[in-house]
A protein has these predicted regions:
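Bacterial C-terminal helix-turn-helix
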Residues: 325-371
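Intrinsically disordered, low-complexity terminal regulatory regions
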Residues: 1-141, 145-161, 165, 171, ...
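N-terminal sensory regulatory modules of PAS/LOV and PAS-like folds
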Residues: 147, 268, 276, 284
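PAS-family sensory/regulatory modules and their coupling/dimerization elements
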Residues: 162-163, 171-176, 279-325
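Regulatory hinge/linker segments at domain boundaries
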Residues: 230, 234, 316-333
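PAS-family sensory domains
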Residues: 114-115, 264, 357
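PAS/PAS-like sensory domain cap-loop motif
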Residues: 119-122, 126, 264-272
């Protein structure tokens, strides 16, 4: 049955055409149209304007160039860690989207395709163009896409048909999410693309989840002596929603995922040179003891907040150097001991002890009151 011109799908495409005309032909901002919800998609207009500023026109033909053989080899070698971490995840993702008319594309941090998966119709030239290893899908090469937008905006995006810059790419609908490595830097991106497919904005959530799985694989690939799975109290532990903090044998942070960076402000974006004692308000050696408990424990932060931590050893890890603390001491008692020590060093001045610890006086009284 033909689709009504008044169907939501047709109205959406008509709205996109209006916005394109406003921005690309009239040179006005899309905001001038007062289009519902366009404000949170202003990144599309920014990308369009970058393309226009570079002298590109929407009706220009695209060639979807592949890098020369030597450059492809260099790209593959440079991204071997990402490929190794991503391939098992891509295999699972490919099965998950097998009946969706969308396929998966993995690119490096520059938008060059390094792997693909899912239901790719090799008889369709439009699919083949995008899924060749080494094809450059950056904004510079093919304009506004979910790939270029995810890399530029550093966040998950959804792009439908004419929201792409070039007419040649207006047949595609794409969801994209950036991939961040253990050092907090963008390592690449994951894309889901359909050709003349129904709009599926929920794929933005799906691609973000699978991107998180790849990020976790990257974090776990770094050699480490202890892995800390962290989450807030009351939340489960043991899946891709965990924050991951990996330590060496001296308690130094060697790898983290993006979730952990959001929970532990000291790590910040791009910061990796930190010691676990800067993160957790307890002797760091006790984290290794927690791995022998094989169950989550509550660990205090210097802010006064508490994280739930599941410490896991990758094998027979040598015990860290002794700090003189009893390794059998429950972690909640360590927290109270640290507070008592701060109060003693402040000569009983609870206000000063709270300031040093970065917590409230009420927290100090509460923690001490339970002993």
């Amino acid at each position: 049955m033909p689709v009504s011109l008044h169907s939501p799908a047709q109205q959406r495409l008509a709205q996109i055409d209006q916005v394109r005309h406003t921005v690309m032909t009239e040179g006005r901002s899309a905001r001038a149209m007062l289009v519902d919800s366009w404000g949170d998609r202003s990144w599309i207009e920014r990308s369009w304007r970058r393309c226009l500023g570079a002298g590109r026109r929407p009706d220009q033909a695209l060639t979807f160039d592949v890098l020369p053989a030597q450059a492809r080899r260099r790209t593959e070698e440079a991204n071997q860690t990402l490929l190794t971490a991503a391939r098992p995840v891509l295999d699972k993702l490919g099965r998950a989207i097998a009946n969706s008319h969308y396929f998966a594309i993995l690119t490096d941090a520059h938008g060059v395709v390094i792997d693909v998966n899912g239901p790719i119709d090799q008889s369709d030239r439009r699919a083949r163009l995008l899924t060749r290893i080494g094809v450059d899908l950056s904004e510079r090469a093919v304009g506004t896409t979910a790939i270029s937008a995810a890399l530029a905006e550093q966040k998950p995006v959804w792009l439908h048909r004419g929201e792409h810059f070039f007419n040649d790419t207006a047949i595609y609908s794409c969801a994209g999410a950036p991939l961040f490595g253990p050092d907090g830097q963008c390592a690449g991106m994951l894309d889901l693309t359909g050709i003349e497919a129904p709009e599926r904005p929920e794929l933005r959530h799906l691609v973000a989840q699978w991107a998180r799985s790849i990020e976790n694989s990257l974090a776990l690939a770094r050699p480490h002596a202890l892995l800390l799975r962290v989450n807030w109290p009351g939340c489960g532990l043991g899946d891709d929603a965990d924050g991951l903090v990996a330590l060496d044998g001296d308690g130094n942070v060697v790898s983290v995922n993006a979730t952990a960076r959001q929970m532990l402000a000291q790590l910040g974006t791009g910061r990796l040179q930190a010691h676990s004692s800067e993160l957790f308000a307890m002797p760091w050696e006790l984290l290794f003891d927690a791995a022998r408990r094989d169950r989550p424990v509550e660990v205090p932060l210097w802010s006064g907040l508490v994280l739930q931590v599941l410490a896991q050893s990758p094998g027979n890890v040598a015990a860290p150097r002794s700090s003189g603390h009893d390794p059998r001491l429950p972690l909640r008692d360590v927290e109270a001991a640290l507070i008592r020590k701060a109060v003693a060093e402040s000569q009983g001045n609870v206000k000063e002890a709270a300031r040093i610890l970065g917590i409230s006086r009420a927290t100090v009284y509460r923690k001490l009151g339970r002993k």
